[in-house]
Design a protein with these regions (language model features):
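A solvent-exposed, acidic/Ser-Thr-rich amphipathic alpha-helical stretch
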Residues: 13-69
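A short, structured loop/turn motif at beta-sheet edges
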Residues: 63-69, 95-102
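Low-complexity, intrinsically disordered terminal/linker segments enriched in charged
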Residues: 105-137
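Hydrophobic/aromatic beta-strand elements that line small-molecule binding cavities or substrate pockets
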Residues: 46, 58-64, 75-77, 89-95
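Short acidic-aromatic low-complexity motifs
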Residues: 1-22, 134
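Residue-level signal for well-ordered, solvent-exposed loop/turn and beta-edge residues enriched
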Residues: 25, 84, 100-102
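Short, cysteine-centered beta-strand-loop-beta hairpins and adjacent loop/turn segments enriched
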Residues: 52, 78-87
């Protein structure tokens, strides 16, 4: 996992993809429709999301390991080439088969991330994240 976060900080997405098994699933829980499978698809998704970044340092707060499963709580700092910064707290589940990732599931708050991003970052994503309404009884 250390290799993954070092590669992410450098934005070496080729190295990230090499750590993933052919059947690795990568899911951002706020956007389940954007779930991808396999190293090439994972790299393409990361290239889209991290476009315009200079680096992505990550601080690990908690790491719990049990056999092939690792739970991580972390803070990412998105350093845009334009000087803007965005901080994102993330909880994640990682599963491994040998040295390869088979599952990468990130839990994070979309509004927190989108509210901090410059307008030029992924302009096709609306900045107002809809909230769920609770039906009246």
């Amino acid at each position: 996992l250390d290799q993954l976060f070092k590669a992410l900080e450098r934005l070496d997405l080729g190295a990230v993809a090499e750590l993933c098994a052919d059947d690795c699933i990568y899911e951002d829980v706020p956007y389940p429709e954007a779930t991808v499978v396999g190293p090439s698809a994972i790299r393409a998704k990361l290239e889209l999301g991290f476009a315009g970044l200079e680096r992505l340092p990550t601080e690990i707060h908690e790491l719990i390991e049990d056999h092939d499963t690792v739970l991580v709580e972390r803070t990412e700092v998105w350093h845009h080439a334009t000087g803007e910064r965005a901080k994102l707290r993330v909880a994640a589940v990682f599963k491994f088969r040998g040295a390869k990732l088979t599952l990468w599931r990130d839990y994070w708050d979309a509004k927190t991330l989108l509210d901090q991003q410059p307008a030029a970052w992924l302009p096709q994503i609306p900045r107002l994240v809809p909230t769920r309404s609770v039906p009246s009884a």
